[in-house]
C-alpha cells in the first residue's frame, strides 16, 4: 500500500526487502534491558517448573521458533546459538518445532509441553507478562541475546514527509505527557524515539556471521 501511514514492522525483513518504508518512530520499552533506548532482545524461555537452569541444559531437546525471517524469533537466537555449536557441527537440538508464527504460540508450545525451549521477542513478552500474567508466569528466562534496535512504526514512501514528521513528533512527545502515563504503562513503554535506519544493519551482520559458522538454520 502506498498510503500506509503507521505500521509496526520488524527491521530485518524490512532491510532484506529493500527498506522501502520510512521509519516514523520506535518504542522505548520500559523494561531494564532497554535502558531507555529503542532496543529489544530475544529471551530463551523454558517452563517455570522444568529442571532447566541454563540454555545449555536444553540441548538435545525440542526447540520452537516463530518464522525464519523473524529477527527476534529466529535470526537473533541463531546468532546466539552459534557460540554454543561445536567444531564437529553436531545439531544442538533433538527436534525443531515450527514455524509457529507468533511469540505467543511459542510460549504456549513451551507451556503445553510441545517444546522445551524457544525464543521470545522481549517486547512481546513484556506485553504478555502485563496482560496475560497467568500464561507468562508459567515460563522462565534462561538466557537472552544482546539488545538490538527494536521494530519501528513505519510509513509507505507515498506518505508525505510532512505527515511523517507530524506523526514522529507526536509519538516522540508521548513520554513527556502525564495524561498518557496509563496508556504508556499498558504498552510497557517509556515513550517513542527516532531511530537511524542504518542501525538495522546489525541484523544482517548477525545473519552472515551465523551462516559463516555453518548455522544457516537452527538445528
Which role does the model predict for each range below?
Residues 10, 29, 33-106, 182, ...:
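Bilobed "Venus flytrap"/periplasmic-binding protein-like clamshell domains
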Amino acid at each position: 500500500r502506498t498510503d500506509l501511514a503507521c505500521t509496526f514492522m520488524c527491521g530485518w525483513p524490512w532491510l532484506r526487502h529493500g527498506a522501502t518504508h520510512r521509519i516514523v518512530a520506535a518504542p522505548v520499552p520500559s523494561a531494564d534491558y532497554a535502558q531507555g533506548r529503542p532496543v529489544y532482545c530475544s529471551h530463551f524461555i523454558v517452563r517455570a517448573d522444568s529442571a532447566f537452569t541454563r540454555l545449555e541444559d536444553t540441548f538435545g531437546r525440542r526447540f520452537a521458533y516463530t518464522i525464519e525471517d523473524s529477527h527476534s524469533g529466529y535470526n537473533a537466537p541463531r546468532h546466539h546459538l552459534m557460540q554454543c555449536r561445536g567444531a564437529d557441527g553436531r545439531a544442538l537440538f533433538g527436534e525443531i518445532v515450527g514455524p509457529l508464527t507468533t511469540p505467543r504460540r511459542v510460549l504456549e508450545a513451551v507451556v503445553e509441553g510441545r517444546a522445551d525451549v524457544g525464543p521470545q521477542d522481549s517486547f512481546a513478552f513484556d506485553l504478555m507478562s502485563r496482560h496475560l500474567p497467568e500464561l507468562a508466569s508459567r515460563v522462565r528466562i534462561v538466557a537472552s541475546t544482546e539488545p538490538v534496535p527494536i521494530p519501528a512504526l513505519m510509513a509507505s514512501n507515498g506518505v508525505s514527509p510532512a505527515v511523517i514528521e507530524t506523526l514522529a513528533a507526536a509519538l516522540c512527545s508521548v513520554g513527556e505527557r502525564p495524561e498518557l502515563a496509563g496508556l504508556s504503562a499498558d504498552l510497557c513503554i517509556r515513550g517513542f524515539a527516532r531511530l537511524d535506519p542504518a542501525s538495522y544493519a546489525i541484523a544482517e551482520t548477525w545473519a552472515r556471521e551465523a551462516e559463516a559458522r555453518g548455522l544457516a538454520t537452527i538445528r
